[in-house]
Amino acid sequence: MGKMAAAVASLATLAAEPREDAFRKLFRFYRQSRPGTADLGAVIDFSEAHLARSPKPGVPQVVRFPLNVSSVTERDAERVGLEPVSKWRAYGLEGYPGFIFIPNPFLPGCQRHWVKQCLKLYSQKPNVCNLDKHMTKEETQGLWEQSKEVLRSKEVTKRRPRSLLERLRWVTLGYHYNWDSKKYSADHYTPFPSDLAFLSEQVATACGFQGFQAEAGILNYYRLDSTLGIHVDRSELDHSKPLLSFSFGQSAIFLLGGLKRDEAPTAMFMHSGDIMVMSGFSRLLNHAVPRVLPHPDGECLPHCLETPLPAVLPSNSLVEPCSVEDWQVCATYLRTARVNMTVRQVLATGQDFPLEPVEETKRDIAADGLCHLHDPNSPVKRKRLNPNS
C-alpha cells in the first residue's frame, strides 16, 4: 500500500473509532500533523486541481464551478486588485453543493493592499477587537505605531515583548458580532469598509449572488500555533446569502464537515490569496481550522507576496500604494502568521432586526475570552465552544 493510500486508510479508521465524534478526531489529527509527511496526503490542494488526473482515494471529487464571467467587468475587478473573472479558476466538491473555492485570483502584488488594510486600517477604531477588553481606546488606537517600532526592530528575540499586532486575535466590522450572545444588533454598528465591501460584491456577483451586501466582517489573526474551533456560522438572519472568506499569509488546513459532527470532514489547504464561498447547503456546515502551516523554508513569505504592487495603479483603483516601511512591518508579521477575512450579509433586503427585550446588564462583546480563535499563549482562559454554535 502506498503512503497516500495508507494515510487515507488511517484517517478512515480514525474517524470510525467510537467515543468521540468524527470531526473532533480529525481536527485533533491535523492539529498534530507533521508538514511534509504522509499526514497531509489526503488534504486537497486546489492550487493544483487543474493538474489532477484522478481524485485521491477516499477524497471527494473536485469539479469545476462555472462562474458568471460577464457579470463583473474587467475594470471593476481591477479596481480591487483582481484578475478578470475569465481568468479565475473556480472549483466545487462533490457532496458539498454551494461550496466554491477560487485559488488566488488576485493580480500580482495586489494582495499587499489587503494585508495592509487588515493590519494597519481595519484594526483601528471604531472597529472592535479582542484587545478592547484589557486596554483603553487610546492604547488600542496606537496599535499600528506601537507594533511598527517593535516589528521593525532588528533584534528579534524570544525575550522581546510581543507587539500589540502580535496579540491581536480578531476584529469585527460593520454589524459587530457579539461573542457572548452569538448575535448581531442594530445598535452596535459602525460603517463597513467601502473597499472591502466592493471586493466582496464583485466576488459574490461572479459566483452568481447578485445584490450581495457586505454588512458584517470578522477578521481572524492567526499565529502558527493558533486554531479555529469547530463551529457553524448561523448568527446571520438571512442564510440564503453566501459567506465569503479571504486568506492571506501562511497556508492553513481547513476542515469542511457536515450538518452534524459525526460526519467526517474533508481537509483542504488554504493558501495566500485563496477565496472560499459557502452558500446553499454548504452555508451551515461545520468547519474549522486545526493547523496553520509554517513555510517549508523557515520564516519566509509565500511567493505570491514577494511581488510588489505596480508602480502605477488605475485612476479609480481602490487598491492603494503600500510604502516600503509599511510593507516591511506587514512582511515581518506574516512570516509567522496568517490573516483571514470573512464577510457576511446579515439581513435580507428590507429586513430589520427583530425586537428583543432590553437586558438589565449588558455584557462586554469585546471579551477575548469568548472568541473561538484559540491562542495557547493568551493569559485569558477561553470558554469551551458551545457544541450547538
From Swiss-Prot:
Impact after mutating D233A: Loss of activity
EC number: 1.14.11.-, 1.14.11.51, 4.2.99.18, 1.14.11.33
Gene Ontology CC, one term: euchromatin
GO process annotations (BP): cell differentiation; developmental growth; DNA repair; in utero embryonic development; negative regulation of neuron apoptotic process; neuron migration; neuron projection development; oxidative RNA demethylation
Domain of life: Eukaryota
PROSITE patterns: FE2OG_OXY (PS51471)
The UniProt record lists the keyword Cytoplasm: no
Amino-acid positions noted as binding 2-oxoglutarate in the UniProt annotation, renumbered to this chain: N220, Y221, Y222, R338, V339, N340, M341, T342, V343, R344
UniProt xrefs under InterPro entries: Alkb (IPR004574), AlkB-like (IPR027450), AlkB-like_sf (IPR037151), Oxoglu/Fe-dep_dioxygenase_dom (IPR005123)
Ranges for region Interaction with DNAJB6: 1-127
Keywords per UniProt: Dioxygenase, DNA damage, DNA repair, Iron, Lyase, Metal-binding, Multifunctional enzyme, Nucleus, Oxidoreductase, RNA repair, Transcription, Transcription regulation, Translation regulation
Coiled-coil segments on the chain, per record: none
Names of the cofactor(s): Fe(2+)
Cofactor binding, note field: Binds 1 Fe(2+) ion per subunit.
Chain residue ranges for the region called tRNA-binding: 86-389
Catalytic activity: an N(6)-methyl-2'-deoxyadenosine in DNA + 2-oxoglutarate + O2 = a 2'-deoxyadenosine in DNA + formaldehyde + succinate + CO2; 2'-deoxyribonucleotide-(2'-deoxyribose 5'-phosphate)-2'-deoxyribonucleotide-DNA = a 3'-end 2'-deoxyribonucleotide-(2,3-dehydro-2,3-deoxyribose 5'-phosphate)-DNA + a 5'-end 5'-phospho-2'-deoxyribonucleoside-DNA + H(+); a methylated nucleobase within DNA + 2-oxoglutarate + O2 = a nucleobase within DNA + formaldehyde + succinate + CO2; an N(1)-methyladenosine in tRNA + 2-oxoglutarate + O2 = an adenosine in tRNA + formaldehyde + succinate + CO2
Tissue: In adult organs, highly expressed in testis, eye, brain and kidney.
GO terms for MF: 2-oxoglutarate-dependent dioxygenase activity; broad specificity oxidative DNA demethylase activity; chemoattractant activity; class I DNA-(apurinic or apyrimidinic site) endonuclease activity; DNA N6-methyladenine demethylase activity; ferrous iron binding; oxidative RNA demethylase activity; tRNA binding
Null mutant phenotype: Deficiency results in 80% reduction of the litter size due to embryonic lethality. Surviving pups exhibit a gender bias in favor of males (70% males and 30% females). Intrauterine growth retardation and placental defects. Altered expression of trophoblast lineage-specific genes. Increased N(6)-methyladenosine (m6A) DNA. No effect on H2AK118 or H2AK119 methylation, suggesting that Alkbh1 does not act as a histone demethylase in vivo. Cells show an strong increase of N(1)-methyladenine-containing tRNAs.
Residues involved in substrate binding: W144, Y175, H176, Y177, D233
Any single Pfam family the record assigns to this protein: 2OG-FeII_Oxy_2
Function (record text): Dioxygenase that acts on nucleic acids, such as DNA and tRNA. Requires molecular oxygen, alpha-ketoglutarate and iron. A number of activities have been described for this dioxygenase, but recent results suggest that it mainly acts on tRNAs and mediates their demethylation or oxidation depending on the context and subcellular compartment. Mainly acts as a tRNA demethylase by removing N(1)-methyladenine from various tRNAs, with a preference for N(1)-methyladenine at position 58 (m1A58) present on a stem loop structure of tRNAs.
Subunit structure: Monomer. Interacts with DNAJB6.
PANTHER family, per the entry: ALKYLATED DNA REPAIR PROTEIN ALKB-RELATED (PTHR16557), NUCLEIC ACID DIOXYGENASE ALKBH1 (PTHR16557:SF2)
Protein's name in the database: Nucleic acid dioxygenase ALKBH1
Upper lineage: Eukaryota, Metazoa, Chordata, Craniata, Vertebrata
Gene: Alkbh1
